[in-house]
Amino acid sequence: MGNCCVSRPSGADKRRRCGSSTAPHTRGGRRVIGAANMRCLSTVSSVSDAARAVMSNEPATVLGNSGSSGNGGVMAAEEMLRRYEIGEELGRGEFGVTRRCRDAVTGERLACKSISKRKLRSSVDVEDVRREVAIMRSLPAHANVVRLREAFEDADAVHLVMEVCEGGELFDRIVARGHYTERAAAAVMRTIMDVVQHCHKNGVMHRDLKPENFLYANASENSPLKVIDFGLSVCFKPGARFNEIVGSPYYMAPEVLKRNYGQEIDIWSAGVILYILLCGVPPFWAETDEGIAQAIIRSHIDFQREPWPKVSDNAKDLVRRMLDPNPYTRLTAQQVLEHPWIQNASAAPNIPLGEAVRSRLKQFTVMNKFKKKALLVVAEYLPTEELDAIRELFNMLDTKKKGHLTLEELRKGLQVIGHNIHDTDVDMLMEAADIDGNGILDCKEFVTVSIHLKKIRSDEHLPKVFSFFDKNGSGYIEIEELKEALSPRGDQKSIDDIFLDVDIDKDGKISYEEFELMMSAGMDWRNASRQYSRAVYNTLSRKIFKEVSLKLDHSGPLVAAGK
């Protein structure tokens, strides 16, 4: 098995001290990238000047001298503007924005994903970007993997020029088709597993397989489906085990929560996608994050609800074997592809799975977009506050002036100065900012991560998020306002289904109370933040397993061993 890159060494010392601000790179009195006259390549963040000051002590570069021009950051960005014309925005995420892009010479249509450096709040975030670029550059070409053309960097962002996918998300396409069958699900799963096998053969573990990370290249009926995001991927060697909790909650394998896993987690995540493809809802669902984690650990699969009684035995057998809680008896990617249901996909039942499945898929997809948009409103548009107070708090707690705090020093210090912060919140802060897992927080990470978690975690922001959607200030979110916010260019018809569920009193509009209920149901909306999700599920993992280190017994299921 070939390894396409080198994975992060565990236990490396990555601590950095708070330092002075670093001025952005300029040339001829202007920003090289970021000004409006530079073809709209401004950074997407509207975080306040205070947050900018905090983040300005990041390393000057993310990719180092790996920019396509060979001369490093700023020169690479100038080269990008010579080679490519940047167009309209295609979408936004937690770390940046994606825009249309065109090769200035050939006219080829591409996409430019710009990752804002101000959004890279810790060295883990920086390493995620470095790894993503390294993996996309080194992974051999595959028809169902989006191709990275070039990577550039400037003072504000990392820019990835890649294939453009304009055919929409996987679930959106399924919902739009209307007629949806088991045979169609089998064809989709074959494609997904081809990608997983390709990654595993080349020593790459994806670690974040979910429907949102699969897009169609174009709107044609026979368009290829492509995986687009390698932001959490890692390279591995046979037999290597990992303990970093990553991924999206619904798709997380039990051994991830147990902090001892290998490439088998990608099979589990694909199995969750398959379950959703066949019935429209996730297999492991609860009203709280802890409930979701517990459901994943229990791994009970419900085959009683519709349409499971009419789903073929072959399909159910494959779901069971992909969602086997024991990673050592779970199917490999090759075994999934050899399973009769996949091998004979054209023989799978071509009977519609029913309108209920299609409706559930639509609701699941649109609701996720609603919650992600709410997260972006908080992360992007609400001002950062209390920066100086947080830095002063760190200095107060750091009585020995070492530039870092242990978890116990943090706990005791907060008690001494009268801050009544719940243990869970203290644990979350440590989990989010303790980069190398050695129980130590440095100043910069304490400040930046506590700001981020405070903003994301506080329910006081929900009224402001509600106001963002309520454009006309009527006190209600009306359907046209929701369409404008969630689907300005896409198929707006799918937004209508939100009202069937969220609009409890059926008055054709969403009140604040209805909005609040929707935001608190199922997976916490704040888990759309990769950093928040990591912190929450790290804390839950320690709580569920009482800080017991778990080992994998090759002859049987997961067993626990004391530290």
Curated annotation (Swiss-Prot):
Reactions catalysed according to its record: L-seryl-[protein] + ATP = O-phospho-L-seryl-[protein] + ADP + H(+); L-threonyl-[protein] + ATP = O-phospho-L-threonyl-[protein] + ADP + H(+)
PROSITE patterns (alphabetical): EF_HAND_1, EF_HAND_2, PROTEIN_KINASE_ATP, PROTEIN_KINASE_DOM, PROTEIN_KINASE_ST
Top-rank taxon: Eukaryota
Binding residue positions for Ca(2+) 2: 470, 472, 474, 476, 481
Catalytic residues (positions): 208
Location(s) in or outside the cell: Membrane
Gene Ontology cellular component annotations, sorted alphabetically: cytoplasm; nucleus; plasma membrane
Lipid-acceptor residues (N-myristoyl glycine): 2
One Gene Ontology term from the biological process aspect of the record: intracellular signal transduction
Binding of ATP, residues: 90-98, 113
Chain ranges of the Protein kinase domain: 84-342
InterPro entries the record matches: CDPK_Ser/Thr_kinases (IPR050205), EF-hand-dom_pair (IPR011992), EF_Hand_1_Ca_BS (IPR018247), EF_hand_dom (IPR002048), Kinase-like_dom_sf (IPR011009), Prot_kinase_dom (IPR000719), Protein_kinase_ATP_BS (IPR017441), Ser/Thr_kinase_AS (IPR008271)
EC number: 2.7.11.1
Domain EF-hand stretches: 385-420, 421-456, 457-492, 495-525
Binding site for Ca(2+) 1: 434, 436, 438, 445
Activity control summary: Activated by calcium. Autophosphorylation may play an important role in the regulation of the kinase activity.
Protein's membrane topology: Lipid-anchor
Binding site for Ca(2+) 3: 503, 505, 507, 509, 514
Keyword terms: ATP-binding, Calcium, Kinase, Lipoprotein, Membrane, Metal-binding, Myristate, Nucleotide-binding, Repeat, Serine/threonine-protein kinase, Transferase
Region annotation Disordered: where it falls in the sequence: 1-27
GO function terms (MF aspect): ATP binding; calcium ion binding; calcium-dependent protein serine/threonine kinase activity; calcium/calmodulin-dependent protein kinase activity; calmodulin binding; protein serine kinase activity
PANTHER family to which the protein is assigned, alphabetical: SERINE/THREONINE-PROTEIN KINASE
Family membership: Belongs to the protein kinase superfamily. Ser/Thr protein kinase family. CDPK subfamily.
Protein name: Calcium-dependent protein kinase 29
Native organism: Oryza sativa subsp. japonica
